[in-house]
Amino acid sequence: MERLLVLARHGQSEWNLKKLFTGWRDPELTELGIDEARRAGRWLKSQGTQFDVAFTSNLRRAQHTCSLILEEMGQGGLETIRNEALNERDYGDLSGLNKDDARERWGDAQVHEWRRSYDVPPPGGESLKDTAARVLPYYIQTILPRVMSGERVLVAAHGNSLRALVMVLDGMTTKTIASLEIATGIPLVYRLKADTTVESKTVLDKDIDQDD
């Protein structure tokens, strides 16, 4: 039985380009972000991948990425389930601020702690621990059972909601997860064992040109 789980961070958004803290704000993808999502779909198709169901957040950049991936794979009508449990981390008072401006206001060390620590939230926002507290129950109760039943599952979401999943899947600690970066538009392909642990993991090489 194949137990396939593919995680994909959304393509570059307009606020990624402007270096703004995004969180639950809802910007669109840039042209590059659209290209990244389409490229991810082409790569997955080239690997012979097909999905039975897709999950995404309530935010447009993840939904658009999900639809573009599926469109490139010829699966545009696939069942797609949206849930705010997969939303990006809420950056609270940082939302909408330029990252350099935030550093000037609060200092490099404080902003770095808010961004990269596991359990220190920005004012009015969520820490990665808080994000994991909503992502992981949804994964365990809703997504994982479908993977374990043999369905091939795509999750198109966000850097921090996916970091919460990768921390569990890859057995990372709260310290090692701090340095993990998940690139926009790069699928992480997991195959799981019967005990739900990881059998294999494949990552799209950013340097591969899928148009060749």
Swiss-Prot record:
Substrate binds at residues 9-16, 22-23, 61, 88-91, 99, 115-116, 159-160. It is an enzyme of class 5 (isomerase). It holds the Pfam family His_Phos_1. CDD domains: HP_PGM_like. Keywords: Gluconeogenesis, Glycolysis, Isomerase. GO terms for biological process: gluconeogenesis; glycolytic process. Its EC number is 5.4.2.11. The record marks H158 as: Transition state stabilizer. InterPro entries: His_Pase_superF_clade-1, His_PPase_superfam, PG/BPGM_mutase_AS, Phosphogly_mut1. Pathway: Carbohydrate degradation; glycolysis; pyruvate from D-glyceraldehyde 3-phosphate: step 3/5. GO terms for molecular function: phosphoglycerate mutase activity. The active site is at H10 (tele-phosphohistidine intermediate), E88 (proton donor/acceptor). Signal peptide: none annotated. It catalyses: (2R)-2-phosphoglycerate = (2R)-3-phosphoglycerate. PANTHER family: PHOSPHOGLYCERATE MUTASE. Belongs to the phosphoglycerate mutase family. BPG-dependent PGAM subfamily. Homodimer. Catalyzes the interconversion of 2-phosphoglycerate and 3-phosphoglycerate. This is 2,3-bisphosphoglycerate-dependent phosphoglycerate mutase.
